[in-house]
Amino acid sequence: MTRLQKVLAGAGLGSRRTIEDWIRAGRITVNGRTAQLGDRAEPGDDVRIDGKPVALPDMASGERQLLIYNKPLDEVTTRSDPQGRRTVFESLPQARTGRWISIGRLDVNTSGLLLFTTDGELAHRLMHPSGEVEREYKVMVRGQPPAEALTRLRNGVMLEDGPARFDSIEPVALQPGADATFKVILREGRNREVRRMWSAVGHEVTRLSRTRYGPVELPADLPMGQWRLIPIAVLDSVGLKTAARAI
């Protein structure tokens, strides 16, 4: 059997440190008994967090999967939606073991690259801010931003949840009288961050698509709404040096 915090981290419920805090707080039970640090669990055990049952992945199989998905507009990155909108999980195949965990999210009006894995610890590490994993987007904004606005975005703008900056801004299409298109890179994934940054310099985002997450690029031949399995090894070392302390 595997230690409880490792099993629950593998299910994508949080880092091992977070789950250890939950155990100390008495929030987790195993087969009706309040869990203690050092407890172990396996598939078939009745594990609950705050009274809610948790599906345990088969850690013994050692089989991890990674999938790339080209998200269309109007799909939500949640397992269910109270408004009845289609979710990205409806388009994914059945995972061989465990369940698919999204590595970050895209809002309903953003398209492009989404990564999914059955390795909860990997997902947590790649999403944690300390990992500083690059996200690349193609963004179209209304109007032609002046050089001053681009400088502000590179140096940093203040949002309601703190400062934010682009590591890189490269023009893709700049035509007088038309919306401008840029390729931008940043190293965090706060809610609607790219849109809010452009709004802070007075330009509305009219189209937004993610084209890269870490070393994984959106394949040019992957149609929107389609998925593809890729080797998980391409992400195993990403974010390890800076994010290890967060796990």
Model-predicted segments: where are they?
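Basic, flexible Lys/Arg- and Gly-enriched helix-loop patches that mediate nucleic-acid binding at interfaces
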Residues: 1-247
